[in-house]
Amino acid sequence: MMMNRQQIDSLVQQMNVATATGEVNLRVQQIVVRLLGDLFQAIEDLNMSQTELWKGLEYLTDAGQANELGLLAAGLGLEHYLDLRADEADAKAGITGGTPRTIEGPLYVAGAPESVGFARMDDGSESAHVDALIIEGNVTDTAGQIIPNAKVEIWHANSLGNYSFFDKSQSAFNLRRSIFTDTQGQYIAQTTMPVGYGCPPEGTTQALLNLLGRHGNRPSHVHYFVSAPGYRKLTTQFNIEGDKYLWDDFAFATRDGLIATALDVTDLAKIKQYNLNKAFKHIKFNFQLVQDADQVPLQRLIVVE
């Protein structure tokens, strides 16, 4: 049976609108009807078989059970598309400036320990074999005025490319902190050098990427939420210069303005200044926040009680 779009839309309406007997969430109904119509049209256009359809549903079930749907959304470019869409909305509204946004990814956890000005992020478990890293910078508005008491939430992977909470071998909130900027708008984080990571090689995301002929690797990076009263919350990250996947990020997160250089510091006075006892890496990364707008996208949160 071949259907045209008018017939498809009529069928979807019959099955999912006309059958309603209870209170309807009109927005959910609108989205479901549109997505089903588009899916039915794709089935017609591509002559998808029932086997292919059920295989797809089985895949989504497996991805959900593996907690990889968020990873899949990043890997297929959905998150990056939303960023581009938000950029276009800003441009149309005449909103300019500010640190570029980029994807959140699926590995944020709310509730990290808070401090003012400075925080040590790592638990010391990798100190003997991984370079220490100092990340510091300032938070200002687009005119360069400092923003004290801005909340800088930071999280990144360890030297194996794993994140605490998702990697049960790490201590709680390892490499996760919330730092409120000091009176000069500054934050300083002492941590360890992260590395990039790949999708689980036997996981559902990599399985689909294999069928598309794509790799599933990310460059070394550090995630941020930056927020302050009166300003739009910024979701972003920087990728570290020199990584082979810097401009070949499977999640499409690398953007101009979001590339950081990790400098080697061997000067003894500098080492002492940061209360360290050996050479370390140093990254300077500043943020500019845009004044608040009427609508700010909500963030997904994993809340740990």
Curated annotation (Swiss-Prot):
SUPFAM superfamilies with a match to the protein in the record: Aromatic compound dioxygenase (SSF49482)
Short name of any one Pfam family annotated for the protein: Dioxygenase_C
Pathway(s) it belongs to: Aromatic compound metabolism; beta-ketoadipate pathway; 5-oxo-4,5-dihydro-2-furylacetate from catechol: step 1/3
EC number: 1.13.11.1
Cofactor note: Binds 1 Fe(3+) ion per subunit.
Superkingdom of the organism of origin: Bacteria
GO biological process: beta-ketoadipate pathway; catechol-containing compound catabolic process
Keywords: Aromatic hydrocarbons catabolism, Dioxygenase, Iron, Metal-binding, Oxidoreductase
Keyword Ligase in record: no
Signal peptide: none
Enzyme class label: oxidoreductase
Residue numbers binding Fe cation: 163, 197, 221, 223
Cofactor: Fe(3+)
Protein name per Swiss-Prot or TrEMBL: Catechol 1,2-dioxygenase
Species lineage: Bacteria, Pseudomonadati, Pseudomonadota, Gammaproteobacteria, Moraxellales
